[in-house]
From Swiss-Prot:
EC assignment: 2.3.2.27
Zn-finger (RING-type) residues: 202-241
Record's protein name: E3 ubiquitin-protein ligase NEURL3
Classification via SUPFAM superfamilies: RING/U-box (SSF57850)
Induction statement: By hepatitis C virus.
Native source organism of the sequence: Homo sapiens
Length: 262
């Protein structure tokens, strides 16, 4: 498929946070500036993405499902590959991780069970020293997705933003606290966010309209959904790193954080 194995890759890669590889991605994938969010623009395929470095045995790859899209069958696929994404010929990437990339290269992946990749879900997956691919969704039980992953050479994480899964975000599993599933998801479903016109997209999801202001810095590059997510997770503006004290419509009074128990 035009890709090659790069076995000289250092299996003991620096312990930098995982990001998506900036170049090796499906034709429909758009990444944010940090390389942490992958959004599939159209169709239900061509959503393959890779980690930017090899993943150690037992290392958890943590991600969150940011958005779903109805009308398709099937969703997120996850796994590992011996393909160094730096050596992948992007035009030759197939539209599907399962089974296309598996059949064309040393790649081992699986489909998450139905109902295990919903908007707001936290997904962790890893391979152990016996070559077993596991996943865990939120606080659920460990799931054995498949066996027989060879572990004698460097392995990169590979994901497919497929079907009903529209956007995912890589998280840092070593952080002191992983974010909980987003409590504002139901309210967002009740009041759908408007789709953006070209040039007015949210800087995080690249889909909804940038209609929300962060207080006090005043940056307005985000939709309501993503602004509240950032407020809950880090409370720091992604643009200027100022502390966020409130979230407001682009025009209107600020909405303050709701404290637990209030």
């Amino acid at each position: 498929m035009g890709a090659q194995l790069c076995f000289e890759a250092n299996a003991k890669a620096p312990r930098e946070a995982l990001r998506f590889h900036a170049e090796a991605k499906g034709a429909q994938v758009r990444l944010d500036t940090r390389g942490c969010i992958a959004h599939r623009r159209t169709t239900f395929h061509d959503g393959i993405v890779f980690s930017q470095r090899p993943v150690r045995l037992g290392e958890r790859v943590a991600l969150r499902v940011l958005r779903e899209e109805s009308g398709w069958c099937g969703g997120l696929r996850v796994g590992f590959t011996r393909l160094d994404p730096a050596c992948v010929s992007v035009p030759s990437l197939p539209p599907f991780l399962c089974p296309d990339l598996e059949e064309q290269s040393p790649t081992w992946a699986a489909v998450l069970p139905e109902g295990c990749a919903l908007t707001g879900d936290l997904v962790r997956f890893w391979v152990d020293r016996r070559g077993c691919l596991f996943a865990k969704v939120n606080a659920g039980c460990r799931l054995l997705l498949r066996e027989g992953v060879p572990v004698g050479a460097p392995l990169w994480a590979v994901m497919d933003v497929y079907g009903t899964t529209k956007a995912i975000e890589l998280l840092d599993p070593t952080a002191s606290r992983l974010p909980t599933p987003m409590p504002w998801d139901l309210s967002n479903k009740a009041v759908p966010e408007p789709k953006a016109t070209p040039g007015e997209e949210c800087a995080i999801c690249f889909y909804h309209a940038a209609n929300t202001r962060l207080v006090p810095c005043g940056h307005t590059y985000f939709c309501r959904y993503c602004a509240w997510r950032v407020f809950s997770d880090t409370a720091k503006c992604p643009v200027c790193r100022w502390q966020i004290e409130a979230v407001a419509p682009a025009q209107g009074p600020p909405a303050l954080r709701v404290e637990e128990g209030s």
